[in-house]
């Protein structure tokens, strides 16, 4: 019996809706990363993007445990001398709550070209409303 390898043309994609109200950031991000990758499907193939679309609502109400709101720091550098920028998780949650969840999920995806395609299937909204009602998303309980 040969191993089944998924082909890009044969992949069917579903839409899932995740409400992250009072859910822990890391636990939610791992589940979302698995769905984006397609690891929840029996047709999972590491070299093919078999994942589904994920819609995340209420991103501003996500929870972080411990003192991570004050202690967790995200760094970026502009490649110029003195160009190091840092922002705490608390400030990022106030300013751009979508970016906080996106950074967490991106860190859990593979570091290759396929990850950029997977990340495009992630739709994050800070409020409770989203414009994807026509896709009839299924609820994903986490």
Curated annotation (Swiss-Prot):
Q: Which UniProt keywords apply?
A: Ribonucleoprotein, Ribosomal protein
Q: Entry's Pfam families?
A: Ribosomal_L13 (PF00572)
One GO term of the biological process aspect? translation
Q: Which domain of life is it from?
A: Bacteria
Q: Which GO terms describe its cellular component?
A: cytosolic large ribosomal subunit
Which Gene Ontology MF annotations are present? mRNA binding; structural constituent of ribosome
Which residues lie in coiled coils? none
Q: Which InterPro entries match?
A: Ribosomal_uL13, Ribosomal_uL13_bac-type, Ribosomal_uL13_sf
Please name the PANTHER family in this protein's record: LARGE RIBOSOMAL SUBUNIT PROTEIN UL13M, RIBOSOMAL PROTEIN L13
Which family does the record assign?
A: Belongs to the universal ribosomal protein uL13 family.
Function, as annotated, reads: This protein is one of the early assembly proteins of the 50S ribosomal subunit, although it is not seen to bind rRNA by itself. It is important during the early stages of 50S assembly.
Q: How does it assemble?
A: Part of the 50S ribosomal subunit.
For this entry, the protein name equals Large ribosomal subunit protein uL13
């Amino acid at each position: 019996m040969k191993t089944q390898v998924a082909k890009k043309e044969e992949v069917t994609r579903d839409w899932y809706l995740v409400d992250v109200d009072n859910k822990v950031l890391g636990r939610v991000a791992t589940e979302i990363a698995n769905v984006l990758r397609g690891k929840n499907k029996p047709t999972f193939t590491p070299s093919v993007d078999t994942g589904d679309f994920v819609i995340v609502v209420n991103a501003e109400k996500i929870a972080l445990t411990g003192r991570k709101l004050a202690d967790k720091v995200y760094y970026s550098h502009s490649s110029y001398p003195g160009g190091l920028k840092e922002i705490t998780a608390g400030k990022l949650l106030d300013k751009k709550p979508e970016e906080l969840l996106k950074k967490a999920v991106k860190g859990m995806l593979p570091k290759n070209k396929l990850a950029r395609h997977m990340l495009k299937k992630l739709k994050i909204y800070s409020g409770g409303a989203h414009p994807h009602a026509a896709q009839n998303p299924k609820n994903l309980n986490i």
